[in-house]
Amino acid sequence: MTKHIIVIGGGLGGISAAIRMAQSGYSVSLYEQNNHIGGKVNRHESDGFGFDLGPSILTMPYIFEKLFEYSKKQMSDYVTIKRLPHQWRSFFPDGTTIDLYEGIKETGQHNAILSKQDIEELQNYLNYTRRIDRITEKGYFNYGLDTLSQIIKFHGPLNALINYDYVHTMQQAIDKRISNPYLRQMLGYFIKYVGSSSYDAPAVLSMLFHMQQEQGLWYVEGGIHHLANALEKLAREEGVTIHTGARVDNIKTYQRRVTGVRLDTGEFVKADYIISNMEVIPTYKYLIHLDTQRLNKLEREFEPASSGYVMHLGVACQYPQLAHHNFFFTENAYLNYQQVFHEKVLPDDPTIYLVNTNKTDHTQAPVGYENIKVLPHIPYIQDQPFTTEDYAKFRDKILDKLEKMGLTDLRKHIIYEDVWTPEDIEKNYRSNRGAIYGVVADKKKNKGFKFPKESQYFENLYFVGGSVNPGGGIPMVTLSGQQVADKINAREAKNRK
């Protein structure tokens, strides 16, 4: 008899797992509380402006292409992606700008401010991150390893310690090899992919730089939601039954097994396996009602990553100095991280990510206008949440900073504005305290690991998404779905012997 898989949540991790399970011959039902598939890969359109509500950067497209190849299909027949050789532009408070290109040589050619020594150091750092990326790919990505003990067993103690560089934090690894203060800050902010601090995260996450340099940075034509639409189409073609607007209220358990889910309609649906794309702690807390003692232990070890104050602005002018992807850096990177991740306050001088897809895709804003998305990282929801007044003051601080750093009269030109706070993120995606990136990567707290993909309490419950390994970011959550499918397939094959 064909076994039934229930997937809770239609984010990229959930839809990826559903596709692989269906490709492997299982009966798969996916339940998504929202009316779209993709989770945080969401879309907002108004007054002629189009915005990616969630992630705006696509990296490692081969992870997505594999899903189509398993079905003997080509991703290019479903969605169009475009490589961006000019990866992003960094603005600094003193007026310095640095353009990051795909390739160290190209970066040197486009930045007269960078010396020969700067480029040599950048190449040396790339070589260092390549070594980490290669060893990470072998075990962490290809085999879905989940813990430090699994890493050590797979690679050997000395090999793991040296090549994963567990001795240093990410920022220590950068500062050891890079002397240019602008490059130090720019490279440190690659940690944005996982919503953490480069001063706390382990050096293994330096591999994010090599990953982007080697695999490229891509734009999904028309908006990144088209990638989610492509995966939804593939899932339906493979026989996945997708229910949108369908909320799972709880997971039924018996001893150490999960038996099915209860929907908000009252209907009970049985399952042989459950894969939750809802974050781990909210799953245990709200769907299973795990006891307080065990929940508290998990919350101490796996603290939420950062959230964000997200502004979608329709602007009645153009700023020629902007690239597609832009970063407006803080005067004091350490203080910014300290305020967000330790003091848990809205930062005085935030680093701001600004994406302007209209620079590449002119369909995203009316002629002569621009669609600007602004994202500074801020703390997840605290026991005493920020107030409406706090957010209003922070909004002014953001606009003041952007105007001071070159976006002249930005306030005057805003003709459309939509804002998401951590509370909106929590409400729409049931994320843990409004975190965007799942679990924080912290060398001391969790050695940079997120939750394992297999439940430690229920033998047929699995997790995918940003709160589990291999981590946040759209390629990683998609890979987590494929890794969970591999684990279930291996388990079933073993049971049949």
Swiss-Prot record:
GO terms for molecular function: oxidoreductase activity. It catalyses: all-trans-4,4'-diaponeurosporene + 2 AH2 + 2 O2 = 4,4'-diaponeurosporenal + 2 A + 3 H2O. Its cofactor is FAD. Its EC number is 1.14.99.-. Signal peptide: none annotated. GO terms for biological process: carotenoid biosynthetic process. Keywords: Carotenoid biosynthesis, FAD, Flavoprotein, Oxidoreductase, Virulence. FAD binds at residues 7-19. The keyword Oxidoreductase applies. InterPro entries: Amino_oxidase, Carotenoid/retinoid_OxRdtase, FAD/NAD-bd_sf. Pathway: Carotenoid biosynthesis; staphyloxanthin biosynthesis; staphyloxanthin from farnesyl diphosphate: step 3/5. Belongs to the carotenoid/retinoid oxidoreductase family. CrtP subfamily. Involved in the biosynthesis of the yellow-orange carotenoid staphyloxanthin, which plays a role in the virulence via its protective function against oxidative stress. Catalyzes the oxidation of the terminal methyl side group of 4,4'-diaponeurosporene to form 4,4'-diaponeurosporen-4-al. This is 4,4'-diaponeurosporene oxygenase. It comes from Staphylococcus aureus (strain MSSA476).
